[in-house]
Each structure stands twice: as structure tokens, then as C-alpha cells.
Amino acid sequence: KAIFDVYRNSFQPSYFMDQPKIITTYAVSVAETTEEAEYLSMPMQITRLNLMRGKLLNVLSPEEANDYPLTEMDKMILQQNRPLMLIGSAEEVVNQIKEEQEYFGFDEAMINCNLYTIDQRLNSYRLLAEQLNK
């Protein structure tokens, strides 16, 4: 929050922007249930884990990712990285975004949904849109 406050207080209007504008991006996995969203998020989580190790592997399917052999250290790292993503039902994710918008005061939020299949991505975006339009 402090960095946003510094930005707002230090902002100098220019030809390009007359007011400060804060845009944030969320990596999300949204499904009908939290459990399904967790399951579908595993490929993204395993990819991040491998990237942290400098490994570039093909993206795993949810089935492969959930069967991926994890060490205790891997599990700890996944747990530490968990706050970097919003995972849950549409209601849970939208509530978290709204809470953070109220706290941080950002002007715009972009959603990045890198689920394994295009149908999973479209469903995630559809569920979010429906919840946001309630």
C-alpha cells in the first residue's frame, strides 16, 4: 500500500496523464468450486515452481500436475507462492479483488487466467464476469 501512496503523492501531471492511475494484474483460477479451482491451478503452480529453478518444461495438464511428485520443500514453496494467485469460486475471487481494491485504491484490475485448456479459461472468465455483474 505504501508504494501506491508514494506514487500518488509524487505524481506529476503530464501530457500523457493528468492524474495518477494504478493498474494491477491478478493471476486467477476460478471454477464452480474452490476445490476445482485449486485442482485447475496446479499446472500454473508447478510451472512457477520449475521457473524458479530455471527449468523450462512443457505445461502439464491438471491431471499431470496434480500427480507431479512434490518434495516437502516443493510443498513449502507452493504454499509460500499461494498468495501470488487468486484461486477459488467466482464469489471468493471477486470478494478478494474488491477488498484489495478498497484497501489499495487501485483504479483498474486486469485478470490473467492461464488455465490448461481454452474452455477452462473461458469458463473462468465467464464465472468472474457473471459474479462482477451481480
Features from the language model and the residues they span:
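Active-site-adjacent structural elements that line small-molecule/cofactor binding pockets in enzymes
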Residues: K1-K134
